[in-house]
């Protein structure tokens, strides 16, 4: 769950007071933090790596795969693992 389920500024768990703008200020934070696409590719017999390779694709956050967000000190918004 990220930033109190997308409710930045709601309760002590977010560690931001009313300055965040209240509940559901960033409803898309939860959706982008939990949407991940994993692509697994097995090398051919001619490949020299001899193992599985994994690539992670993400449409947002520059490929950041973290799912825990934390509010900034100015309560201006939430940033996921400083990947914004």
Curated annotation (Swiss-Prot):
Q: Could you list this entry's UniProt keywords, alphabetically sorted.
A: Cytoplasm, Metal-binding, Metal-thiolate cluster, Stress response
What switches on expression, per the entry, is described as: By Fe, Zn and auxin in roots, and Cu and Mn in shoots. Down-regulated by cytokinin and cold stress in roots and shoots. Down-regulated by Cu and salt stress in roots. Sinergically down-regulated by RAC1 and sphingolipid elicitor.
List, in alphabetical order, the GO biological process terms annotated in this UniProt record.
reactive oxygen species metabolic process
Query: What Gene Ontology cellular component terms go with this record?
Result: cytosol
UniProt keyword DNA-binding, yes or no: no
Pfam families from the xrefs? Metallothio_2
Where in or outside the cell it occurs: the entry states:
Cytoplasm, Cytosol
GO terms (molecular function) for this protein are:
metal ion binding
Give the tissue specificity.
Highly expressed in inflorescences. Expressed in roots and leaves. Expressed in root primordium, pericycle, phloem and in the basal parts of lateral roots.
| Record-stated family | Belongs to the metallothionein superfamily. Type 15 family.
Function of the protein: Metallothioneins have a high content of cysteine residues that bind various heavy metals. Acts as a reactive oxygen species (ROS) scavenger in the cytosol. Possesses superoxide anion and hydroxyl radical scavenging activities in vitro. Plays a role during root development, lateral root initiation and seed embryo germination, possibly by regulating levels of cytokinin.
Q: Which PANTHER family does this one have?
A: METALLOTHIONEIN-LIKE PROTEIN 2A, METALLOTHIONEIN-LIKE PROTEIN 2C
Comment field (misc): Down-regulation by RAC1 during pathogen infection may potentiate ROS which function as signals in resistance response. Plants silencing MT2C show abnormal plant growth and root formation.
Q: What is this protein called?
A: Metallothionein-like protein 2C
Q: What is the lineage of its organism?
A: Eukaryota, Viridiplantae, Streptophyta, Embryophyta, Tracheophyta
Record gene name: MT2C
